[in-house]
């Protein structure tokens, strides 16, 4: 049985890709987050994230993506945010479609912990940054595109959520995606 097969029966749609983020805190391994991407509902957004997980997207021949990227913003009982492999501080913006891309749709909602959603700076400003919810966050519905959910690894999400933070909700320990890809 492959890693993919372990999660296949949990999928919302049988063709949805499954990706993973292997994470460390302060250099120590804390776990892996396994995510279903909702390509059946948000194909463009899911593909953007998938390519940044696999390293398929290249700029000037160099792979760009989430490997060695940090979770730069953590708010307990709300969300963990990462994906800024451009600047590492929440100011970077890049997508496989150019600098940013439009909101695909708001069909899926922030119904509880473990929802994967695009971080943005307003309407139609999606790029590489994402967040995973730690609670129901329905006030974000119709503002942020939900495009996946955690299948396995909520304990890892909770570990990240509970890391002490400083100014701007920045974790005091570096929370790093040391490996990522597609199952």
Swiss-Prot record:
UniProt keyword Zinc-finger, yes or no: no
Protein name: Peptidyl-prolyl cis-trans isomerase 11
GO CC terms, sorted: cytoplasm; intracellular membrane-bounded organelle
UniProt feature coiled coil, ranges: none
Alphabetic keyword roster: Isomerase, Rotamase
Family: Belongs to the cyclophilin-type PPIase family. PPIase H subfamily.
Organism listed in the record: Caenorhabditis elegans
Gene3D superfamilies in the record: Cyclophilin-like
Catalytic activity, reaction form: [protein]-peptidylproline (omega=180) = [protein]-peptidylproline (omega=0)
PROSITE patterns: CSA_PPIASE_1 (PS00170), CSA_PPIASE_2 (PS50072)
GO biological process: protein folding
EC number(s) from the headed UniProt entry: 5.2.1.8
Gene: cyn-11
PANTHER family to which the protein is assigned, alphabetical: PEPTIDYL-PROLYL CIS-TRANS ISOMERASE, PEPTIDYL-PROLYL CIS-TRANS ISOMERASE D-RELATED
Protein role: PPIases accelerate the folding of proteins. It catalyzes the cis-trans isomerization of proline imidic peptide bonds in oligopeptides.
One term of GO molecular function: cyclosporin A binding
């Amino acid at each position: 049985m492959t890693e993919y097969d372990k999660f296949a029966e949990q999928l919302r749609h049988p063709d949805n890709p499954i990706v993973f983020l292997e994470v460390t805190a302060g250099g120590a391994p804390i776990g892996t987050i396994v995510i279903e991407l909702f390509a059946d509902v948000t194909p463009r957004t899911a593909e953007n994230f998938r390519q940044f997980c696999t390293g398929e997207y290249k700029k000037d021949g160099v792979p760009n993506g989430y490997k060695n990227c940090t979770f730069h913003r953590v708010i307990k009982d709300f969300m963990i945010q990462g994906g800024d492999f451009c600047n590492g501080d929440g100011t970077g913006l890049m997508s496989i479609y150019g600098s940013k891309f439009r909101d695909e749709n708001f069909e899926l909602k922030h119904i509880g912990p473990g929802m994967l959603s695009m971080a943005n700076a307003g309407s139609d400003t999606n790029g590489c940054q994402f967040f995973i919810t730690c609670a129901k966050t329905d006030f974000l519905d119709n503002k942020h595109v939900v495009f996946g959910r955690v299948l396995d690894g909520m304990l890892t999400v909770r570990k990240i959520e509970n890391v002490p933070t400083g100014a701007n909700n920045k974790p005091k320990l570096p929370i790093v995606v040391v490996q990522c890809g597609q199952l």
